[in-house]
Design a protein with these regions (language model features):
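Substrate-binding/catalytic cleft of secreted carbohydrate-active enzymes
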Residues: 357-359, 366-561
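Beta-strand-rich binding/interaction modules
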Residues: 148-150, 231-265, 271
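Exposed aromatic-hydrophobic patches
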Residues: 164-171, 270-278
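Accessory beta-strand-rich segments of carbohydrate-active enzymes
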Residues: 2-21, 40, 44-45, 59-63, ...
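Active-site-adjacent substrate/metal-binding segments within catalytic domains
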Residues: 91-127, 133-139, 143-150, 156-159, ...
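Extracellular recognition modules
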Residues: 181-183, 292-296
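Accessory carbohydrate-binding/adhesion or oligomerization-edge regions at the termini
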Residues: 1-101, 183, 256, 532, ...
Length: 561
């Protein structure tokens, strides 16, 4: 089959998406509640009768230059290798591993990037016995950018490596055999926002999903909880795709096998619901009590599909300069967590579970998702096992501090990049907003600025006023902080002064959070006892996140050179 490959999108600024679906909450639909309830969170993605996981063996051809990519590309004659998806090019022999902290891999001239760059062509053949009424293709993680084609036709384009990229592919599918082609470029304009301290790798590194749904189906949902007195309310809305006529939406809150409450309402395009005076147990990292909330779409009384949310009831408030959860000051005994395994960026369910259970065994109670949103399964595990999460947007421009001059605000204060910033923050929020584990939103890391961050903060304050916003970079501006004061690697004397509210540079009446401290890559860390003596002496000091959870490494098979 022949494809005319787009060779412009990855370098066409300010473009960052074509034909992508709007951001929405992550969920895996099932055709009925009973089957979903009997499925664990680790298996949920892989056992749904409405979702096909396309991960596994794919055809793959690596080109070291875009100019070598045939035009048109004929997949019938293309010499493909076989590759496992998800995977990284650098861990499968196509490029050597490359680690860098601050710099870009090319001269820093935003938004310009090298143009004749490596590109990977992925192909997946799959069969459909019948066509559904709606079909959504989801890439949970691709770096750096992605053009999608199906059955010879162009579908769309995406940047934003760690945010979900979804496409409506119903018009392109057919009964029988289908061919999916994904073209991944090593760099894009978006690379300027992904200059994180890590191995710089490429490829489809998270799962690929195809959901096949009814003409009217669940498209998005939101759940919020609020404490009033000694009880909680739960409110939310369900967004439907398709015609809601003749449908109802049932919302059921379960505590194990016991029903807490249920209601069934007439479906609208946007269906609101509310529960009042719920006598429930609160969620915390120490006692992570969750309730299973099932949202079921019905037609003529029969289930069409269901989704599950692990609902935690907790209240976050800032009282003067003290951060509280459920009315009590808490300490974040945290770590910074990169996606890193012997497979590179690839972290399967077993890897995610191992990290979470190890954290709990070591008395870690918080994790900052440095420096991008994680696989959504990680957040579900944090809900269930009890970890406070600082959910961080996929924004870092650290290379502007190095090459060719020190100019940290170069991108963050440039209005032409604003929509790129807002898109990454908006998609993080929409995907992750229903997780009780999230106690702080983070606007990114080491991106200088403040102008584009201000707009992102305003957006989060508007849509989610109940969760505070953090961004360390603002400490070097006149704003000093958004909702919490954030610094990295502060001297212990400074931490003591802040805790005693006698800091030389007045930071305002806000809690103090060390987003990074006690640097522990390689040899380290030191001074933990001194830091924690200070943190425990003052309610203003929230604690912090050690840099970092695990060293980054490459598997070196025995005998390899």
């Amino acid at each position: 089959m022949k494809y005319v490959i787009n060779r412009e999108n990855y370098k066409k600024f300010p473009l960052f998406e074509v034909n992508k679906c709007e951001g929405r909450a992550y969920f895996i639909p099932y055709s009925n509640r009973e089957t979903l309830a009997a499925t664990s969170c680790l298996e949920e993605r892989y056992k749904s009768d409405l979702v096909t996981v396309l991960s596994g063996e794919w055809d793959f051809h690596y080109y070291d230059k875009v100019s070598k990519l045939p035009q048109p590309l004929d997949t019938d004659v293309e010499a493909f290798d076989r590759i496992q998806v998800p995977s990284d090019w650098q861990r499968t022999g196509y490029e050597p591993p490359f680690y860098v902290n601050q710099r870009y891999q090319f001269p820093c001239k935003p938004p310009k990037i090298p143009t004749d760059i490596p590109v990977g062509v992925y192909r997946k053949i799959f069969s459909l016995e019948t066509l559904s009424d709606q079909s959504i293709l989801t890439f949970l993680g691709v770096i750096s950018s992605l053009d999608v084609y199906i059955n010879g036709q162009y579908v769309g384009y995406s940047e934003g490596a760690h945010n979900s990229a979804e496409f409506d592919v119903q018009p392109f599918l057919r009964e029988g055999e289908n061919e999916l082609v994904a073209v991944v470029f090593k760099y894009s304009n978006g690379t300027y926002l992904e200059c994180q301290d890590m191995f710089r790798e490429n490829g489809i590194f998270r799962d690929v999903l195809l959901s096949r749904r009814a003409a009217t189906c669940l498209n998005d949902y939101q759940i919020k909880t609020k404490k009033t007195g000694n009880t909680y309310s739960l409110s939310g809305k369900v967004e439907l795709a398709g015609n809601p006529a003749g449908h109802t939406v049932q919302i059921t809150i379960m505590a194990g096998d016991s029903m807490v409450s249920t209601q069934e309402v007439t479906a609208q395009q946007s269906t609101a619901f509310s529960f009042q005076d719920l006598a429930v147990r609160e969620w915390s990292a120490e006692i992570p009590t969750v309730y299973e909330t099932y949202i079921t779409l019905k037609k003529d009384g029969q289930p069409v599909e269901s989704l599950r949310n692990y609902t935690g009831f907790r209240s976050i408030t800032i009282k003067k300069d003290v951060f509280t959860l459920n009315g009590k000051a808490i300490k974040l005994k945290g770590v910074n967590h990169h996606d890193t395994s012997l497979k590179g960026y690839v972290m399967d369910a077993e890897d995610l579970l191992r990290d979470v259970t190890l954290m709990k065994s070591l008395n870690v109670n918080a994790v900052r998702t440095s420096h991008y949103p994680p696989d959504p399964m990680f957040l579900t595990l944090c809900d269930l096992y009890g970890l406070y999460v600082v959910d961080e947007a996929d924004i870092e421009t650290h290379g502007t501090c190095c090459d060719p001059i020190y100019w940290p605000n170069r991108i963050s204060n440039h209005k032409k990049w604003l929509q790129h910033y807002l898109d990454r923050v908006r998609r993080m929020y929409l995907r992750d907003r229903n997780h009780p584990c999230i106690v702080l939103w983070s606007l990114g890391n080491e991106a200088g600025g403040w102008k584009n961050q201000d707009a992102c903060c305003e957006y989060l304050h508007h849509v989610c006023p109940e969760i505070p916003v953090h961004y360390e970079g603002v400490i070097r501006t006149r704003r000093l902080a958004y909702d919490v004061i954030s610094e990295m690697y502060p001297h212990i004397d400074h931490v003591r002064e802040v805790g005693e509210r006698r800091e030389k540079k007045k930071l305002g009446e806000k809690p103090f959070f060390m987003c990074e401290y006690a640097h522990a890559m390689g040899v380290g860390p030191g001074g933990l006892a001194e830091y924690w003596d200070a943190v425990l002496s003052s309610d203003r000091l929230m604690g912090g996140c050690i840099w970092e959870w695990a060293d980054h490494a490459v598997l070196n098979p025995e005998g390899a050179k």
